[in-house]
Amino acid sequence: MVFMDKMKLAAKNADSKAGEAVDKSKYKSKIYEEENEIKKLYSKIGEAYYTAKAEGKDASADLDAMVKEIDDRKAKIVEYEVKIKEIEEAGQKEREQNKAEAEAAAKAREEAKAAKEAEKSEE
């Protein structure tokens, strides 16, 4: 590949990686938010359990609801992690495609140049 081809490829790949980083950061932020909410729920579970025991009440329904919410939030985290993996894979494919296109363009230019030189030598 010629220097300019390499520069174009580097620019395309940098753009690809930047877009990938932005998309991944959105999901990482969502994961962080879910993890914080889970921590709050753990605290609420402890408080609800203590209060129920201290007052001699049954907190099963409240605790079950909070446990379900934690499970739901953990499921969201898994979904977000899958999305991040998909973004990484798509970015990698895009960069591989960029490289293949750049190599094909360079090869086509080299073949055209060789054909032109062959034409000149025949004259």
Residue map of PLM features:
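Alpha-helix N-cap/helix-start motif at coil-to-helix transitions, marked by capping-box chemistry
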Residues: M1, D5, E35-S43
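Short, charge-rich amphipathic alpha-helices with coiled-coil/heptad character
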Residues: F3-D23
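Short, charge/polar-rich alpha-helical segments
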Residues: K17-N36
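Amphipathic alpha-helix face/heptad-repeat signature
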Residues: K30, E34, M66-E69, R73
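Short E/K-rich amphipathic alpha-helical oligomerization segments
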Residues: K39-V67, D71
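Amphipathic alpha-helical coiled-coil segments
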Residues: E69-E88
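Long, low-complexity, compositionally biased polyampholytic IDRs enriched for Lys/Glu and Gln/Arg
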Residues: E86-E119
